[in-house]
Regions:
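Subset of outer-membrane beta-barrel
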Residues: 19-359
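Sec-dependent N-terminal signal peptides
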Residues: 4-12
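Sec/Tat signal peptide C-region and signal peptidase I cleavage site
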Residues: 14-18
């Protein structure tokens, strides 16, 4: 039953006859990657400096200066109904000091019940006609980071290719670009900015009308949408952080910032022009070996179903990490942030840094 409702949610989001510009188009690319960043509530816009950077701020790749890095992450949502995976590789380029990276992201839901053929043209129900299908979102990111003259300033760019598939019903291709900037000030403060979908990201859909639609008693259900193109508008993430040395063994790095969506949403600050959501997170590091992290984000105004009163919800997160030489294992846990939901998701990620192994 859960997968039936999940499938209906997917259909309503993808095949609706809404405007071409949709609020949650390619939303899977906003999840992030790496249990470190997810445990800190996304508070890594100005301090993520490894192979996970393309998903947060590609300018952070510039700190990979010795050898290549590889990473992988796996997570499951809604009691394992949805599965999210990430794999990436990054390497500095010897000729000009820049860093190149390639990342692949997948979010998929398998075994969704297909009931489009359950009722025949005369209105008779045949449960044997129920089948199943999978819905998957894929993205490949090609990233490049460089320093445009100043050693304190770095710039990064993502080129994104998106492929989305909804069983036999529809598939779509999209492309777009992200732009990131990092600045490390003299006083140790780090400033970061990430403009997602900087030129807008465009998806072109192909719909299989024969598989999607159903005719019952002469009336057509699930007609193909009129618009075959959807546009993802830019989003701006801003962050500021600083690393504090508590003593010889302990360091604390907090970050705070704003996520700005150029459309009207349920964010705590929302106008017709933009919606602004604050976030914050911190990492406590012991001897660069053990890490404890917390974060909070996704503040939004919601209506309580029982009392019908307006209130603010948010998404807390936490996690730990352990590092040995060039191998880092991270874990994060977070909930959906919807009305105090008890649905928690677990994230595991593994990073290999050959620069640490060989030095």
């Amino acid at each position: 039953m859960k997968k039936i409702f999940f499938g209906l949610f997917i259909f309503s989001g993808i095949f609706s006859d809404a405007q071409i510009i949709r609020k949650y188009s390619n939303e899977f690319l906003n999840i992030g990657a790496g249990a470190r960043g997810l445990a800190m509530g996304g508070a890594v816009i100005s301090n993520q400096n490894d192979v996970y950077s393309p998903m947060w701020n590609p300018a952070g790749l510039i700190d990979i200066d010795r050898d290549w890095q590889g990473a992988a992450m796996h997570a499951e949502y809604f009691e394992s109904i949805a599965k999210y995976d990430y794999i990436a590789f990054a390497k500095p380029l010897d000729n000009n000091g820049g860093v190149f990276a390639i990342s692949v992201v997948r979010l998929g839901v398998d075994n969704i019940l297909n009931t489009t053929q359950m009722i025949d043209s005369e209105g008779n129900i045949d449960y044997d006609k129920i089948s199943s299908f999978s819905q998957s979102d894929y993205a490949a990111l090609l990233s490049y980071a460089f320093r445009p003259g100043s050693h304190r300033l770095s710039v990064g760019v993502n080129a994104k290719l998106v492929y989305r598939n909804v069983g036999k019903f529809a598939s779509g291709y999209g492309f777009g670009f992200d732009l990131g900037v990092l600045y490390n000030a003299d006083n140790g403060v780090n400033y970061g900015a990430m403009l997602r979908d900087a030129t807008t990201t465009v998806n072109f859909w192909t719909v299989n009308q024969d598989e999607l639609s159903a005719v019952v008693n002469g009336e057509e259900f699930n007609p193909a949408p009129k618009d075959k193109m959807e546009i993802t508008m830019p989003k701006l993430n801003l962050g500021i952080s600083k690393n504090f040395e508590i003593n010889r063994d302990l360091e604390l790095q907090p970050e705070a910032g704003l996520n700005i969506d150029f459309t009207k949403t349920a964010a705590v600050i929302s106008t017709d022009f933009a919606s602004i959501t604050p976030y914050a997170g911190a990492e406590l590091k012991f001897q660069d070996m053990i890490f404890v992290r917390v974060g909070v984000n996704r503040f939004q105004n919601i209506t309580d179903i029982e009392s019908l009163k307006r209130k603010v919800s948010f998404q807390p997160s936490a996690g730990i990490g352990i590092k040995y030489q060039g191998l880092t294992l991270d874990y994060a846990i977070t909930n959906s942030g919807i009305g105090g939901s008890n649905f928690y998701s677990n994230f595991f990620s593994l990073k290999l840094d050959m620069g640490d192994f060989r030095n």
